[in-house]
Amino acid sequence: ALTERAFSWGMALCTAFCAVLLRGFAVQVNNDAAVMLKQKTTVVNLANRLCTRLEENADYQNGAEVVILGEPKRGAYPEESPLKPMERAQFGPLSFDPTFNAHGWYVLVWDELGVQLNECADETVRAISNSDAFKAMPNYPADGCIQTIDGVVTLKVADFPF
């Protein structure tokens, strides 16, 4: 009788412990989803403003290649969520690597806004992101954040961390 009673208490404690863990996991997943949705909404709204600025550029209007570089959170849009998301959820939809960052902007602008930018080659993106001209450019929304570098319309959202 004692072992049955101990077993039932053990099962009850185990079940309660698992329920607490499951609830914590569900809360964390919801926090992460809320943070990622807010980040995406912020970036899409920013992308809309960036495209509006690009459309004013004569080289863009003439079909020049375009590259958008930088993470909004490293520029004018730093973000700290009070929801305490997991570390990977805080990365946002854009990479810190210049090539993947540029590709992320191309995909985001096309998927969310229906605007197809004239992409440039990965080697060109790397060359521009490492150039002194790019490093000297101000970040969006300052005047001069859009410049033509080596024939590519370059829009600088933020500096890269390296």
Q: Locations of the language-model features?
A:
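Intrinsically disordered, polar/acidic, low-complexity terminal segments
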Residues: L22-F162
